């Protein structure tokens, strides 16, 4: 069968199915496995009225027949009424005269009547009431039986639903057609009228001249002509041409998708080749194809504007569409895949723990739609329908990025990174028997790691991909602890001490624990928490310490409870920790804000240390830079932000700004913290 979807209407013909869709399109780049079928156009996408000459002619003919019928009925009624004695007496009364206003005179031959007539819509209740009334007027048993059957039918739920559909279609079919401009040169016509009225001196002519020359009216006529010109330039779409073309496809079910192609609005669809067919491969979120809901993955493209597509590769399709603009008509074979209606997907926010560049990825299905991002970026995942390739927006780019981009799915990224590590380990040289054994065990573990679905011991944290995030605004009375991380001689201790000295009422340090004896000038609970070695070791076993160590046979450490005491006091806890402590801290309920203090360039670092009276050797500077890279690579996923300390005063101001921002703006934190 043939079904045509035009401007929301559905009409049915025979043999083949046809659907018309209004969509739009963006720019195209290079072919990979899929290609985005987008190309530039002159106008923005908009819904255009479909005007079919044959239909319009039939409507005009029906209107003319109805007008003649009404005239004949009117004449008949007039003859009947004229024979009335009462009307003859009324005719003797002289008629009232009024003022003849030529403005409202119509030209000869023009009949002002609406092409659509009001259709009364009956409700089920009206039908039921009418049947009950008829039932009371009928007396024979056969009629009563027939009415009873009809009443049962009217009360049937399926009938009532069908009746509602009938009413809805009736209302829709009787809506007036969109207006079509009579002329596109209203400005010229107004100028001509003003020229004709120049020699005229009577009041009405002067008033009309002033009206037509008013700036607002001139602007209105200009706007009218611009819109009318676009409307009248559209070539009326002829269904006959399309029906002739689809006849060659025999009994195959086809559909027509109508698109108004634009230069700057993306279509959001990709195509691929299957043998000699061109198949819609992917519908991208945010595009006109996805919003219309009428273009589907798996549809085969047969024709575009009467040009046969079968046998062309995706590059030829791109070249073809590049030269087309305006209204495009696609003839498609619908996909045979039966898919459940897509559920409304919840947007998931994730933090990326790796860098991604689609131009360097041989696996991305459509390189033009690949979304690049850097470690630490927030991504808004809006579709996981394809588990290997998610559709996402990058934080801050939603307004500038009309189409969602493709990013690797979590499992897919983990598996290929595991395989990549396995291949790299296979290439490592074997140096000694002992190293060979260690390498062999590691390699074996990684190979098991690759099969993530079958490995119960699989550690997701070992291969970092994404971390689900949520927005969190810290309460005024419960501040997040500030953690400063960085290699030695990068200034984190100096920055921490400056904050403590300048704003003592706002910042505080956690009181550490120790097993050494208290000295005379020390106060328990202020300088240290003095505990026995046995108690200290028990707390270590219980995981109560963020970090701990041994110095001169005495244990020292910072506990989670010590940090919590500062938070409960309403102050901001300042800590300078080693990277080994970050995992324990992040797994606690303290919600830390971790700032990485990074060194500047090697030359700038030498100058800064020289100001402090230090004269480091070149190898020491290289070691600091290398340590920085190592910390970023191994622990960068824990960092909330970073400060490059090229000047201590500027670094201090930036640190203070970031801390103050926690009070005014919500921050992205792991979703697990808020559960």
Curated annotation (Swiss-Prot):
* Region entry Required for the correct localization of PALS1 and PATJ at cell-cell contacts and the normal formation of tight junctions and adherens junctions, spans: 1-345
Designated gene of the protein? PALS1
Q: Does the keyword Nucleotide-binding apply?
A: yes
Stored InterPro entries: GK/Ca_channel_bsu, Guanylate_kin-like_dom, Guanylate_kinase_CS, L27_C, L27_dom, L27_dom_sf, L27_N, MAGUK
- List each copy of the PDZ domain by range: 256-336
- What does the record give as the function of this protein? Plays a role in tight junction biogenesis and in the establishment of cell polarity in epithelial cells. Also involved in adherens junction biogenesis by ensuring correct localization of the exocyst complex protein EXOC4/SEC8 which allows trafficking of adherens junction structural component CDH1 to the cell surface. Plays a role through its interaction with CDH5 in vascular lumen formation and endothelial membrane polarity. Required during embryonic and postnatal retinal development.
Name one molecular function that GO assigns to this entry: ATP binding
- Boundaries of every SH3 domain copy: 345-417
Q: What's its membrane topology?
A: Peripheral membrane protein
Q: Where is the L27 domain?
A: 120-177, 179-235
Q: CDD domains annotated for this entry?
A: GMPK (cd00071), PDZ_MPP5-like (cd06798), SH3_MPP5 (cd12036)
Record protein name field: Protein PALS1
Family, similarity comment: Belongs to the MAGUK family.
